Amino acid sequence: MSNLENLTSKIIEDANKEAEKLLSEAKKEENKIVNEKVKKGEKVKEQIIEKSKGEAKTKAERVISNTQLKVRNNKLEAKQEMINKVFDEAVIKLQNLPQEEYLNFIKNSILSLDIEGDEEIIVSPNDKNKIDISFILTLNNKLKAKGKKDLLKISNENRNIKGGFILYKNGIEINNSFEALVDSLRDELEQEIIEALFS
């Protein structure tokens, strides 16, 4: 569990750094959009006043209101894009873990699960060569020492995941892919990221 806490802490720290950068870019874009829309709104307003002062005020207010609504929607979209980017970056950082860290992560994650010890480990085609027989033997020895079966093996099946693993047995899967782990933390971390990005 401490491995997951360290991972969570690292994701939050990286997210905060990425958030500052993304927020700066988003604010520049927001100012640009607002300035352009306000100028356009003012121009439309002046043209309308020429034709009819009574209608001009109503139309100008409508243009400004629509512009404000568009800006608000654009800001919401930009915020969601930035949040998604932070989580995507977290998955990429996990994918780029050094081999030893990656194998330790897999080992510690499997050993922390309540499993019987005779499951199959499904990984991505890219990760298949990272897990060798000696790693599986070590893992099985540790499972045996915990009173579990020592029959864990690498599956012949591959999955299109970005890293991590899926444990499979009798039609039941435990998804510990990097995407699933980051998604499982999303609800917990999203509010912290929003506060870091937009407060």
UniProtKB/Swiss-Prot annotation:
Keywords: ATP synthesis, Hydrogen ion transport, Ion transport, Transport. InterPro entries: ATPase_E_C, ATPase_V1_Esu. The gene is atpE. Belongs to the V-ATPase E subunit family. One of its GO terms (cellular component) is proton-transporting two-sector ATPase complex, catalytic domain. GO terms for biological process: proton motive force-driven plasma membrane ATP synthesis. It comes from Clostridium botulinum (strain Kyoto / Type A2). Coiled coil: none annotated. Produces ATP from ADP in the presence of a proton gradient across the membrane. It holds the Pfam family vATP-synt_E. One of its GO terms (molecular function) is proton-transporting ATPase activity, rotational mechanism. This is V-type proton ATPase subunit E.
